[in-house]
């Protein structure tokens, strides 16, 4: 397949949004050159051409190369439609939660390997709320990122594909940096890709 088809096919198989944005226009009005930008997963590229279509083609070549270099094309899989639907809805409310949160630091959260979301001690979180979606999606990302083994709970278990699907979708929605601290905590910095909102969370990891 050509690079454009490769990138679009990969995005569809992973349930990830793929958007090309015109961020500028250079040159005289009679001969403009369009500046097109695309942020996809952890990749960000910008190309300029007199044709928007050709600029997008150039970006797809770069993204296709990124996917190959990172071994993602070989590992690409098709997630269940229900997983992708959940990821899309949760991702939307994840970004909304960040935008509405006044504090830039949220602490502490605990990561317990038989729970379904990050939580505070003795804290009740309403199922289906934006708070729940935020914590659950972030938990799936951390589980996938850190390679944490999850135990079964109340006759329920996490599907590895489900966790991977939500994790991949989240990285297409926001930028996340995770650092292991000497004390055992995870320092998580979340940056929304479409604005200047930045949040830092200190998360206590416990088995």
From Swiss-Prot:
The keyword Isomerase does not apply. Residues 2-69 form the DRBM domain. Gene3D superfamilies: 3.30.160.20. Transmembrane segments: none annotated. Coiled coil: none annotated. It holds the Pfam family dsrm. The keyword tRNA-binding does not apply. GO terms for molecular function: RNA binding. Keywords: RNA-binding. InterPro entries: dsRBD_dom (IPR014720), Seadorna_dsRNA-bnd (IPR026388). It comes from the Viruses. This is Non-structural protein 5. It comes from Banna virus. The gene is Segment-12.
């Amino acid at each position: 397949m050509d690079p454009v088809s490769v990138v679009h096919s990969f995005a569809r198989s992973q349930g990830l949004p793929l958007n090309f944005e015109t961020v500028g226009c250079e040159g005289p009005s009679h001969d403009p050159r369009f500046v097109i930008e695309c942020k996809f997963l952890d990749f960000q590229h910008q190309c300029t051409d007199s044709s928007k279509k050709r600029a997008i083609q150039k970006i797809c070549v770069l993204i296709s190369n990124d996917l190959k270099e990172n071994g993602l094309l070989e590992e690409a899989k098709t997630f269940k439609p229900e997983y992708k639907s959940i990821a899309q809805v949760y991702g939307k409310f994840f970004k909304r939660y960040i935008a509405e949160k006044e504090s830039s630091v949220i602490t502490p959260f605990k990561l317990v390997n038989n729970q379904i979301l990050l939580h505070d001690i003795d804290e009740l979180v309403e199922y289906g709320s934006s708070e729940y979606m935020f914590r659950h999606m972030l938990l799936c990302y951390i589980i996938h990122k850190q390679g944490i083994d999850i135990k079964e709970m109340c006759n329920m278990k996490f599907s590895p594909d489900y966790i991977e699907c939500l994790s991949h979708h989240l990285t297409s929605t926001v930028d996340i940096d995770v650092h292991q601290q000497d004390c055992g905590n995870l320092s998580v910095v979340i940056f929304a890709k479409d604005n200047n909102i930045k949040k830092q969370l200190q998360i206590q990891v416990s088995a």
